[in-house]
């Protein structure tokens, strides 16, 4: 199957290893991966701030960038969710709405794609330790990808997956929310870290780099010895096992 990678801004700028891991794993699973060079930001920061006309410009660029793609896959539930918003952006423009719907229908978050499209839950990954999952808000509440990450992690040899207390709570990032409401955001991520500690996990696993960067920053500030890792890094055997704490 031919797959086009939508890398996302945070992966492209800060977490390139996540993008590389995504490509490597998809290729191991039999996919042919390309990278449409015209892709830029999905427009989510502008959209969340109320700049919908500016968002349309970004959306049109992305629609054109992936128009020839068979399937689009991204290592982010948040950015994939933004693609799903595109048809509504063009509700008063039938031509662009149809093109936006075509893109939305063929775009998947990477774990969702592996489980629901490829039909794979065991990718042959190995990692010793205990992991807990942070189910990001956009990934679960908006995209509806609730079970795929756990299905994949539960098949990782040597890894025990435990439930995160209050797992449904937001980590406090929320894009521009973390800037505009920094005090509230700080309290929210502190609560998330408390829950991670309570879980006893060695690894905090997520599917959105934005949440992981936010949580990892607070883990480091508080001196908590837990690794915050993107799920694709575990599935691609890129995470070094922790030593006994």
UniProtKB/Swiss-Prot annotation:
Organism domain of life: Bacteria
Gene Ontology biological process: lactate metabolic process
GO annotation, cellular component aspect: cytosol
Molecular-function GO terms, alphabetical: oxidoreductase activity
Pfam families: CCG
InterPro entries named in the record: Cys_rich_dom, LutA
Described function: Is involved in L-lactate degradation and allows cells to grow with lactate as the sole carbon source.
UniProt record similarity statement: Belongs to the LutA/YkgE family.
Matches recorded under PANTHER family: LACTATE UTILIZATION PROTEIN A (PTHR30296:SF0), UNCHARACTERIZED PROTEIN YKGE (PTHR30296)
Name by which UniProt lists this protein: Lactate utilization protein A
């Amino acid at each position: 199957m031919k797959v086009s990678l939508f890398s996302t801004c945070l992966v492209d700028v800060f977490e390139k290893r996540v993008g590389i891991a995504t490509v490597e794993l998809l290729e191991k699973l039999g996919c042919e991966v390309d990278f449409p060079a015209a892709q830029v930001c999905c427009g989510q920061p502008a959209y969340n701030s109320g700049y919908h006309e500016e968002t349309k410009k970004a959306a049109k660029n992305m629609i054109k960038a992936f128009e020839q793609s068979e399937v689009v896959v991204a290592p982010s539930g948040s950015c994939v969710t933004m693609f799903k918003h595109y048809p509504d952006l063009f509700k008063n423009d039938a031509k662009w709405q149809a093109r936006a719907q075509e893109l939305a229908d063929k775009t998947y978050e990477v774990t969702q794609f592996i489980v629901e499209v490829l039909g794979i839950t065991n990718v042959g990954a190995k990692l010793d330790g205990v992991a807990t999952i942070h189910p990001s808000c956009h990934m679960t509440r908006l995209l509806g990808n609730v079970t795929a990450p756990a299905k994949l992690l539960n098949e990782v040899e040597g890894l025990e997956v435990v439930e995160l207390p209050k797992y449904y709570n937001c980590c406090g990032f929320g894009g521009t929310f973390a800037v505009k409401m920094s005090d509230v955001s700080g309290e929210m991520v502190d609560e998330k870290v408390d829950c991670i500690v309570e879980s006893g996990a060695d690894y905090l696993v997520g599917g959105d780099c934005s949440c992981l960067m936010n949580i990892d920053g607070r883990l480091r500030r508080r001196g908590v010895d837990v690794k915050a890792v993107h799920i694709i890094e575990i599935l691609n055997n890129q995470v070094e096992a922790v030593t006994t704490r």
